[in-house]
Amino acid sequence: LPSRYPNLLVNGTSGIAVGMATNIPPHNLSETIQAIFAVMDDPDITVPQLMEVIKGPDFPTGGIILGRKGIRQAFETGRGSIMIRSKYRVEELSNGKKQIIFYEIPYQVNKANLITKMASLIRDKAIQGVTYLNDESNREGIRIVMELKKDAQEEVILNQLFRLTPLQTSFGINMLALENGRPKQLPLKDIIHDYIDHQVDVVVRKTQFELKKAQDRAHILEGLRIAMDHIDEVIHMIRSSKKDEAGLSQDLCDAFGLSMIQAKAIL
């Protein structure tokens, strides 16, 4: 589609077809546009240079991407895997206890299922030292509260949670898309080049359409100018003619060197 921004990269997409699948993560709009400018300025820009502009995927649910190796591999080859970890903070309560608050979770993780999994692990004592778990999320954002016992070590509990629950999960990147009607695994630069080429095609076609429209209008205006220069003769010919519109149009063409389109516009 003639998108004014690179929708495929910004919004991402996922899908499955016969024998192939795609899983393109979303990216930051501003960074993606700046990356396009960077490629336009230097078509031979390297992936490390490009990663200074577009840092990596930008997931709407937040979280932290651990490391940059998976991002670089995906940008260079069109395929890679990244690890996403929930964002959290540890707060001290007035009673001396601590609580862990998770306020961003990995992309495509179902929050209800996540909390159910956490509660199950606590209930089965796979994770110990937790006295309270509650979902306090609202329109302001995600807030999963976990209160710990006084002697609990939050680092141990966090490591267990990241290992046993979707609070930390991997995201497989497979940037497969149609290029000239054929499925192809596309590195980041290829997607950007294809988008730029597509935009050039859109602008050229739009300009050609507008030019043709303007030329057609100019052609009609030229006919009207000729008619105005011979207004008395034109009016007399129209009033005295016994012919139908087609015949009268032909007479105007013969008399004043007009095209049929100009003659019909005059009538």
Mark where each language-model region is.
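Hydrophobic side chains in well-ordered alpha-helices
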Residues: T32, L114-K117, I157-L158, I266
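A common structural junction motif
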Residues: M40, D44, I122-A126, R163-T169
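Long, charged, helix-rich clamp/arm modules that form nucleic acid-engaging surfaces
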Residues: I54, D58, P106-Y107, V130-L267
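A short, contiguous, amphipathic alpha-helix enriched in charged residues
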Residues: Y103-Q128
